[in-house]
Amino acid sequence: MWIGIISLFPEMFRAITDYGVTGRAVKNGLLSIESWSPRDFTHDRHRTVDDRPYGGGPGMLMMVQPLRDAIHAAKAAAGEGAKVIYLSPQGRKLDQAGVSELATNQKLILVCGRYEGIDERVIQTEIDEEWSIGDYVLSGGELPAMTLIDSVSRFIPGVLGHEASATEDSFADGLLDCPHYTRPEVLEEMEVPPVLLSGNHAEIRRWRLKQSLGRTWLRRPELLENLALTEEQAKLLSEFKTEHAQQQHKHDGQA
């Protein structure tokens, strides 16, 4: 997969190219990341990249010419088929389904805004899609871009150490992930659930699915509204609710 970055601070992306899962993907040739800074496309000695907005108001906008030239340079390097994405709080909110969609693209160009944003005409003429990582304000598009790169790269074959990891992540099937445990078996009198030590893979799968359903019901119930539960899932969720109610009753009785 090839990803082009348009950013005033391309050095920030060393966090992606040099470390962790994405760093290994770059090292192994599974992910290629190139960057272009609008500053390199300025024509004045101050390398100016911001300009005042028409109509007044606080803040500045990214200057049109350097930004467009940087995007054009990235498009030329990418060749045919590159999708241009602007990281914007006004875009579609990124979720696992969206990540899965974006991962089908072999070439992405990510435009990172700064200041108060970019000229609307640049969005209309150069941008294919706008994406957001949440309803809050950041100083620029670099962190959202890194979030997108990290999440999308997990779908590239060979990137993860275990091929099932991406499909078993939280949200991969519309549910939160189940609890996980490692050594020691007992930590401050808290024991690993016996089923995980049983070696019975069918029961382990059933337990994990029940916990995943239950955790989603407790923490993100709105996610269940969009799911058509199978007969097994409905039964497991019902069991979880009963067990949870019993635990709450026991806890209340001890309080």
Swiss-Prot record:
<dbReference type="InterPro" id="IPR002649">
    <property type="entry name" value="tRNA_m1G_MeTrfase_TrmD"/>
</dbReference>
<keyword id="KW-0949">S-adenosyl-L-methionine</keyword>
<protein>
    <recommendedName>
        <fullName>tRNA (guanine-N(1)-)-methyltransferase</fullName>
        <ecNumber>2.1.1.228</ecNumber>
    </recommendedName>
</protein>
<dbReference type="GO" id="GO:0005829">
    <property type="term" value="C:cytosol"/>
</dbReference>
<keyword id="KW-0963">Cytoplasm</keyword>
<feature type="binding site">
    <location>
        <position position="113"/>
    </location>
    <ligand>
        <name>S-adenosyl-L-methionine</name>
    </ligand>
</feature>
<keyword id="KW-0819">tRNA processing</keyword>
<keyword id="KW-0808">Transferase</keyword>
<feature type="binding site">
    <location>
        <begin position="133"/>
        <end position="138"/>
    </location>
    <ligand>
        <name>S-adenosyl-L-methionine</name>
    </ligand>
</feature>
<dbReference type="InterPro" id="IPR029026">
    <property type="entry name" value="tRNA_m1G_MTases_N"/>
</dbReference>
<comment type="subunit">
    <text>Homodimer.</text>
</comment>
<dbReference type="GO" id="GO:0002939">
    <property type="term" value="P:tRNA N1-guanine methylation"/>
</dbReference>
<comment type="similarity">
    <text>Belongs to the RNA methyltransferase TrmD family.</text>
</comment>
<dbReference type="InterPro" id="IPR029028">
    <property type="entry name" value="Alpha/beta_knot_MTases"/>
</dbReference>
<keyword id="KW-0489">Methyltransferase</keyword>
<dbReference type="Pfam" id="PF01746">
    <property type="entry name" value="tRNA_m1G_MT"/>
</dbReference>
<comment type="function">
    <text>Specifically methylates guanosine-37 in various tRNAs.</text>
</comment>
<dbReference type="InterPro" id="IPR023148">
    <property type="entry name" value="tRNA_m1G_MeTrfase_C_sf"/>
</dbReference>
<dbReference type="GO" id="GO:0052906">
    <property type="term" value="F:tRNA (guanine(37)-N1)-methyltransferase activity"/>
</dbReference>
<dbReference type="InterPro" id="IPR016009">
    <property type="entry name" value="tRNA_MeTrfase_TRMD/TRM10"/>
</dbReference>
